[in-house]
Amino acid sequence: MTTSDSAVHTQPFQAEVSELLHLMVHSVYSETDIFLRELVSNASDACDKLRYEAIESPALLGEGDALKIRIIPNKTAGTLTIADNGIGMERQELIDHLGTIARSGTKAFVSKLKEAKDGLGLIGQFGVGFYSAFMVADKIIVVSRRAGESDVWSWTSSGGSGFEIARASEEDAARVTRGTEIVLHLKDDAKKYLETYEIERIVGAYSDNILFPIELVPEEGEPRQINSASALWQRSKSELSAEDYKKAYQQIASAFDDPAMTLHYRAEGRYSYAVLLFAPSTKPFDLFEPSRKGRVRLYVRRVFITDDADLLPGYLRFIRGVVDSEDLPLNISREMLQNNPQLVQIRKAVATRVVSELEGLAEKDAENFAKIWDAFGAVLKEGIYEDFERREKLLALSRFTTTTGEKRSLKQVVADFKPNQTEIYYLVGDSIERLKSNPRLEAATARGIEVLLLSDPVDAFWTSMPTEFEGKPLKSLSQGDLNLDLIPRVDATDEAKKDEPEADEAATIAVIKAALGERVSDVKASTRLTSSASCLVADSQGPSRELERILSQQNRGMRAKPVLEINLRHPMVGAITKAQAGSKAVDDLSLLLLEQAQILDGELPEDPAAFAARLNRLVLQGLGG
């Protein structure tokens, strides 16, 4: 033991932790009960970790008490203690786990927490529930001894800018033989949490299904267990109520919302395993964090192994719950999990069952399915791109905003096909509102064709592959040639409007090509425009313009030159034919056709200053200036 180890060290919190603590110390949240749920959950995790490590090193458990959690109120001292005899922490682990938040997205999380009405739910989702204790305590002392170690450490903070860490006193060291003890010095307005009935109420509401016994140690009387400590997923569905499932979901997911879908079953056969999975009804703030993985916990015969086993594909990462295997070896390493043949089969079977359950929910309970789709539809669509085996099912599950203004399934869209329509049409962009006014819709709108309006970033990816639904190809209105001539227009009088073009096709295209030079790959007469002058489209063989835009923003490829389509019936295009080839007016009008198409596509002209000067020049000419 060195002198420096013996001394009391004061260390600052990580900046984001200080900000988080400030929110907790000055909390305006009313649901302060969460602190006990979070501390009990952390204690349970510590017991899980010890049980897992003891598979390889049985001596860590020793001959002592069974793994458990104790809650000890002390009205005389005004303290509430939550203690476990789990894995415990060394000095550096106390610093790392309680002084920093070692994961990406921390700044975004703290910012979101400031804005969120359900901030407490975010705390549990992000895995920083320990800090919620500062809502009710003005001082916290943590005493911990790691399993198999002799040193005992004490961590103390009042929720300010830092914390103290030192060797524990002899008295504390004698009391904490293994695990962690958290002593909360409660604020005056939080003394209700010293009442045994309050503690029992909170444990019953949030922690009843914790797998380890939770003992309440009153100041008078004998300790007693206050939770059922049963693996709810191992029980029969007939024994469980909707309220049981709700409590289990909220405990497993550290959530406050109700589950929108519950899947509970037992698989028997070649492999035996129990499954209890939930789909939340609200979206977690970090759903699209690159580091976010699935949150399904793997157990083997009720022993927690890991929550990092990738039990479901990435597009189902919003699902929470438990898979408990009867056949996997208890001592399976986390490294072996990825390629274990049993687990490969379990992953495949569980993913198929989840998708099947979503299909059933979509048919039988449209309201709850809508909650799932609104929160997680963008994630589910990743599966259309990633999971060829289930692509057709995921397409059937998908709900798309269309030009009808409603969210519709592809089955509904196909059922309402117009005469002679053979393809499902779509447009990809960055917002529904901008897509609604996109000029590429004009020919389809004139025929009453329903078009999918796709505005999630993932839409640019899954639509980049040849895709069809029930034999009907999906066709982009912004890529390749378009021929809608066989589909009659809604208003027959519209047919008369396309009789005489304002411009001679070959001559006009040649003039515009000459004016634009290398800015575009080609100039074509448009079959998709009825009232706008021009639009940009991508070649049928390459990536869409939307995918190009996303990839270029990530520095992942050059953008191809677009095809400029012109409306030969538009007066502006007709004016180009009438003007003298090579004149300034022809150059200005041709460039303006390109630049306004870029603007309508959500892009800036290549040279905004030149565009403004050109526009001013043409306006003044029109005014006779």
From Swiss-Prot:
The keyword Magnesium does not apply. Disulfide bonds: none annotated. It is found in: Cytoplasm. It comes from the Bacteria. GO terms for molecular function: ATP binding; ATP hydrolysis activity; ATP-dependent protein folding chaperone; unfolded protein binding. CDD domains: HATPase_Hsp90-like. Residues 550-625 are annotated as: C. GO terms for cellular component: cytosol. GO terms for biological process: DNA damage response; protein folding; response to heat. Its main location: cytoplasm. Pfam families: HATPase_c_3, HSP90. Keywords: ATP-binding, Chaperone, Cytoplasm, Nucleotide-binding, Stress response. The keyword Cytoplasm applies. Residues 335-549 are annotated as: B. Residues 1-334 are annotated as: A. Belongs to the heat shock protein 90 family. Homodimer. Molecular chaperone. Has ATPase activity. This is Chaperone protein HtpG. The gene is htpG.
